[in-house]
UniProtKB/Swiss-Prot annotation:
Gene Ontology CC annotations of this record: plasma membrane
UniProt lineage: Bacteria, Bacillati, Bacillota, Bacilli, Lactobacillales
Quaternary structure (record): The complex is composed of two ATP-binding proteins (TagH) and two transmembrane proteins (TagG).
Biological function: Part of the ABC transporter complex TagGH involved in teichoic acids export. Responsible for energy coupling to the transport system.
ABC transporter domain location: 27-246
Protein name as it appears in the record: Teichoic acids export ATP-binding protein TagH
UniProtKB keywords: ATP-binding, Cell membrane, Membrane, Nucleotide-binding, Translocase, Transport
PANTHER family referenced in this protein's UniProt entry, alphabetically: TEICHOIC ACIDS EXPORT ATP-BINDING PROTEIN TAGH
Naturally occurring in which organism (per UniProt): Lactiplantibacillus plantarum (strain ATCC BAA-793 / NCIMB 8826 / WCFS1) (Lactobacillus plantarum)
């Protein structure tokens, strides 16, 4: 049975640990000591669905979580909690996204194509179309690090739209480039819409959103404030922006500081309790059973960020074995002799020379 939605997000959060140093990062990873790490929640429980063939716009002020959502959907970064189900191949288009700067334009085309499952023959078939669309001429043979921002954006867009993804994610990619390239991009996006492709369009440009999108999601400091028909949601966002800009600078500053503090103070445990309370109202199961179900759902796609005791033991054994075999290799002795007499590893060079001398004299 075909999925009702192409993209499904349920109770998705994203936490960033603001490490003060690399030492703190290592201590936290290995779960050593009590490291006080400041945290910031870019997403605070977002649930969102995108239908097949739908163009969904994502709007919001800077820092609202728009790009975080697009990166999670595309698989660039993982969510902290919640479920993300994407039914189809995704291709994200942002300024320079996915391009390897030390590779040439041609090499990037091949790499991106292979990563999307295309054969060399299929990549060669679209190569010229990509170069023509990007309009970068002889620079296609130069390293991407030598490109301008506009050239990188054009190449990234051209590659993404020619590898035929099921879901195209466009993150501010139309903000760079001249009017001619912009129109080519719009025409290509409209062509994708006619083909029934799913599009997620992240932008500050409300006119572009109104032109291209069927529905719009309004993100606001990590929360999904509203999702609905394009005109209605964009009108609400415009009114908010107008009213906000009319406030004094002191008010705007205080408001932003307060919202960012809410993101820093977000309590995932309290959020989970809230979900349990809401679900328990409509369930005939016990609250304890509902709590277990909610917890499983929140964390079933999540890998642990810290090492468990078992993992630490495995790592310790692996390190010991690595050091042991390295010393055996340097000493010139067999593994068996090193196990029977480990002291030979303490002075490997001298012992190895003596053994070679004995061998030479015996001849």
């Amino acid at each position: 049975m075909e999925n009702q939605y192409k993209v499904e997000l349920h109770n998705v959060t994203k936490e960033y640990d603001l490490y003060r140093s690399n030492n703190d990062k290592l201590k936290h990873f290995f779960n050593i000591g009590n490291v006080d790490v400041p945290r910031f929640w870019s997403l605070k429980g977002v649930s969102l669905n995108v239908k097949p063939g739908e163009a969904l716009g994502i709007i919001g002020i800077n820092g609202s979580g728009k790009s975080t959502i697009s990166n999670i959907i595309s698989g660039i970064i993982p969510q902290t909690t919640g479920t993300v189900d994407v039914h189809g191949d995704t291709s994200i288009i942002s300024i320079g996204a996915g391009l390897k700067w030390n590779l040439t334009g041609d090499e990037n085309i091949r790499l991106k194509g292979l990563m999307q499952g295309l054969s060399i023959k299929e990549i060669q078939a679209v190569r010229d179309d990509i170069v023509d669309f990007a309009d970068i001429g002889d620079f296609i043979g130069q390293p991407v690090k030598d490109y301008s921002t506009g050239m990188r954006s054009r190449l990234g867009f051209a590659i993404a739209v020619h590898i035929n993804p099921d879901i195209m994610i466009i993150d501010e990619a139309l903000s760079v480039g001249d009017d001619t390239f912009y129109q080519k991009c719009v025409d290509k996006i409209m062509e994708f819409k006619k083909q029934g492709k799913t599009i997620i369009f992240v932008s500050h440009n409300l006119r572009q959103v109104e032109l291209l999108c069927d529905r719009v999601a309004w993100m606001h400091f990590g929360d999904l404030l509203e999702v609905g028909e394009t005109k209605e949601t964009v009108d609400h966002y415009r009114k908010f922006s107008k009213d906000f800009k009319a406030q004094t600078a002191a008010y705007r500053k205080k408001y932003q500081v307060g919202k960012k503090k809410e993101q820093a103070d977000f309590d995932i445990v309290a959020y989970e309790r809230q979900l349990v309370e809401e679900k328990a109202k409509d369930s005939d199961k016990s609250k304890q059973a509902v709590s277990r179900q909610v917890h499983r759902t929140l964390y079933k796609q999540i890998l642990p960020e810290k090492m468990t005791i078992a993992t630490k033991l495995v790592m310790l054994v692996a390190i010991v074995l690595f050091v042991f075999f390295a010393l055996v290799n340097v000493s010139g002795h067999s593994v068996t002799s090193a196990i029977e007499n480990p002291t030979v590893l303490l002075h490997p060079v001298n012992h190895y020379i003596k053994s070679q001398s004995v061998l030479f004299n015996s001849k």
